[in-house]
């Protein structure tokens, strides 16, 4: 299931469509030339028209979280391949952080700390006078929003260092 054309939310919707009723999720991701060349998706004329063209544009960790929202990246039934060249180390780091932050979210929910964590994150953005990042549009069918709870924050700020290190190892 190869997908890539537009925003992370658009491709996430496509991934969920292609994976519906399948025993496993095979997510083959194509990136746009802006991402592949490591460019900032700026409003410069030579870049703006290429954003999301022939691939998904990923320039932040939040973009990666939105792209794979609703898929448990550490599950043996989820396989991800990415067509990347030059920015491979950066894209791989974003992917690994997305997978770890998903597991931080899972841990906080299992420990009954999720609602308090959401309030803490909300307060953080309010105090900073910033709008919290969000998934643009409605979640596609089959997407439970897993992985979106840490938009705008890193999992290492939400749990004790020992817990975070254990989650990273696992």
List the model feature ranges, each with a label.
Residues 1-170:
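Catalytic alpha/beta active-site cores
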């Amino acid at each position: 299931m190869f997908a890539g054309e537009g925003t992370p939310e658009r491709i996430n919707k496509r991934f969920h469509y292609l994976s519906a009723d399948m025993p496993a999720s095979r997510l083959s991701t194509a990136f746009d030339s802006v991402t592949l060349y490591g460019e900032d998706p700026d409003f410069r004329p030579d870049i703006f028209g290429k954003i999301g063209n022939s691939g998904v544009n990923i320039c932040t960790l939040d973009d990666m979280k939105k792209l794979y929202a609703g898929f448990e990246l550490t599950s043996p039934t989820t396989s991800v391949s990415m067509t990347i060249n030059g920015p491979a180390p950066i894209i791989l780091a974003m992917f690994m952080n997305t997978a770890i932050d998903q597991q931080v979210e899972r841990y906080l929910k299992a420990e009954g700390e999720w609602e308090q964590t959401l309030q803490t994150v909300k307060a953080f953005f309010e105090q900073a006078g910033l709008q919290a990042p969000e998934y643009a549009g409605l979640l596609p069918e089959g997407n439970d929003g897993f992985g979106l709870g840490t938009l705008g924050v890193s999992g290492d700020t939400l749990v004790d260092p020992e817990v975070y290190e254990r989650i990273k190892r696992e």
